[in-house]
Amino acid sequence: MMRPDWFNPPLLPGMPDFHDSVEYLRFSRNLSRESIAHEAGISVSRLNQLILQRQIPGPKVFDRLVRFHGLSPAQRRHWEDLLQPSRPLVSADELRRRLIAHRVQDHLDVLDQHEILGGYLDPLQTVLMGNEVLHRMMPGLDQADYNIIRWMLTPAARDRVHGWHGELLGLARNLRTALGRYRDDPRAQELFHTLRKDIAFRSAWDGTPMQVTYDLPRATPMYLRISGTSKPLALNLEINEYRACSEVLIVHGLYSTPAIAC
């Protein structure tokens, strides 16, 4: 279908929202609600209720919208999160107390001895506890309130991270999944509003509408520029849920030690 030159799809600049995303998909395809209802097998009145009255779809209507828009499994899961009540976040201080009680510092110390990056993150990608290797790899993290996304927007991160823009896009996709779950929590809203003040984050967020990442393993390494090395250092990250505390992710970073002057 040819679109007029003046047509521009709307952005999804705000916190993740099911009803906003349904309208975004409609506008991005330049379709009327009537045409979507007909093609998806939904009554026009029901679709209008979903959008205008912000009602929750039943399973059949939900499935038909997912199929009509060709959503990926991750996008479907994101919609499912958005239709569930927002979850409360456990405070960073409380999560740190739990980690200390589990003596995770002992594990971090062992990782330092083997030159392996180690850290524990909350759902908003704030480093709750990290070892010396992590802080060496991420200079100035403390000045970003220990939040990885905020750190990525600093000059230090731009200098350190090879392929910085692509990494920022990946973080935006990961953040969208977390904000979908915790969207009404004041900490989540405060972080999002803080990030929106940065033009690079706004560009990354607005440029990846409906793009989400749930898979924890990374298929490719993260490349860092390290002083004294001729090539960017390939850091292979392993990310898993911390079994002793489901709200926490544990991160390990592996690289070839001969490649860096320790």
Each predicted region: which residue ranges?
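Conserved hydrophobic/aromatic packing and binding residues within compact polymer-binding modules
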Residues: 22, 36-37, 47-50
